Amino acid sequence: MKQYNAIKVKHPDAILLFRVGDFYETFGEDAIKTSKILDIILTKRGAGSQSETELAGFPHHSLNNYLPKLIKAGNRVAICDQLEDPKLTKTIVKRGVTELVTPGLATIDGVLNPKANNFLASVYLGNNIGVSFLDISTGEFLIAEGSIDYVKKLLENFDPSEILISKQKKLNFLSKFNNNFQLFFLEDWVYQYDFAIESLCNHFNTKSLKGFGVEKLKDGLVSAGAIMHYLNETQHQKINHITSINRIPKDDYIWMDGFTIKNLEIFHSFSREGKSLIDVIDKTISPMGGRLLKRWVALPSKNIKLIRNRHLTVKYLIDNETALSSIQENIKEIGDLERLISKVATGKINPREVIQLKNSLAAIEPIKKLLKKSKAKSLKELSNSLDNCNQLRKLIERTLNEEAPVSILKGNSISSNFSKELEDLRGIAFSSKDFLDKMLQEQSEITGIPSLKISSNNVFGYYIEVRNTHKDKVPEQWIRKQTLVNAERYITDDLKKYESKILGAEERILKLEIEIFQGLINKMYKYIKTVQNNALIISQLDCFSSFAQTAKENSYCMPDIDES
């Protein structure tokens, strides 16, 4: 427990999932809490001794089933993994926290709502109040600064799952804002302007932030710097999908306070049977379209030109029913591009999801052609901005099997003929039946035993089974391993050599498939921004289609805008 205690003391506010063999174990108060949330058995380690402590655990392969429940219960979870192969060490296996999952930094599907962002916020109480929002599942990074009322409205509209605050400003924050949010407190030194600029410039690989148009938002940048620090502290270093930081334009939107949002039942109805505004108008098909629609409703635009452009686009889709139907059918084939490409950056994507990404990009091609033929200027502009990602699709197609499994560890993820070495190894590993049938025939002819049988188990590996009626014909060089009631089991040098060859091939196949898959992911990095842009365009198109569908169903007409 010495190793466990040394790691736990660094994460006192988190449930520590401690990898022991094939299980994640929790101890003490963590075990009591975990067993209640997950409804798993609570037992004791060292029962009756002075070191007795509560224990609860689950198989490591069930992490994605259990982790969402812990996070949804409002917990921070530190995942402590084995950092070396137990077979290669004679001492205690090295362990360390590989990820700290918090409510605001969740990338697991079971935690995330497909049609809602999951924002981590940071608030800095400076001359103004600086605030920033990051959704690590999509890469969206936003900053703003202003008065208490303005930041209150931002927090109410963006509804973050977690807010970062300086420890020294805790009471000040609580006196100004409600305490309905989940808060996490950082050391005061984290909220420094120079530290923030250095952190942000290092991440974006720039000398300044002028290119993002945020350099004047000093208090906002301080809050954003705290988010960058928090990402590093929680072991979230793979964040290439965070490609920009954008200012929230204060004057572009109508800002609604929490009271207004609640009483207009925009997102939640007062009654269980009732429907909110978003429930009524959301006809989006894709998760990312649903998220964007929610943003448009939460932050109504004041830009007259933008509003008119949206109206004309929706009118075109209403008047062109075939185009609307075709767009909707193709969007159905598109997965959550935004979150899939984020998983590429964070290294959390699996082979099946990469195939889903490829197929989603393929569905963009007919949409692009359809928009290009459109007479609506706005839709033609969207078409010009869409990228077919042909090279990326071909790369994935060459590398992965179309029926690739969820886990790379299950094997058969890599396409046949991609690697000669891999195909040769597969030939050795998967042609064992032919080889063993041939060996069986040869040994039957040599020994004169017609009823030989070759099988395997976890104890002896491969063996030859001889019925007792023929055991006097067994060659001297065969080694007896087990005596049964009606038969005896033997091994031979040739059989053991072939077994080693098969096991070696299977081990090498797995290692090679992992290497090839990781190589594919590395090659996909350069397409992140392109796919993110595609995701944004498809989201907008999905929202326009949703408005058109709602208008058709309810006989809405296009309003006139009076600027008087």
Task: For every predicted segment, state its role.
Residues M1-Y316, S325, E329-K332, D336-A345, ...:
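Charged catalytic and DNA/RNA-contacting regions of genome-maintenance
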Residues D434-I454, S555:
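Flexible, glycine/threonine-enriched loop-and-boundary segments that flank and lead into catalytic domains
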Residues K2-A6, D13, I521, V531, ...:
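Conserved phosphate-binding elements of NTP-dependent enzyme cores
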Residues I307, N330, I334, S432, ...:
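Intracellular alpha-helical coupling/juxtamembrane segments of multi-pass membrane proteins
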Residues N401, L484, E488-N522:
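Extended, charged coiled-coil "arm/hinge" scaffolds of SMC/Rad50-like chromosome-maintenance ATPases
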Residues L395, T399, Y462-W478, S555-Y556:
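Cytosolic, long alpha-helical scaffolding segments
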Residues K473, L536-S564:
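Conserved NTPase motor "head" modules and their coupling/switch loops across ABC/AAA+ ATPases, GTPases
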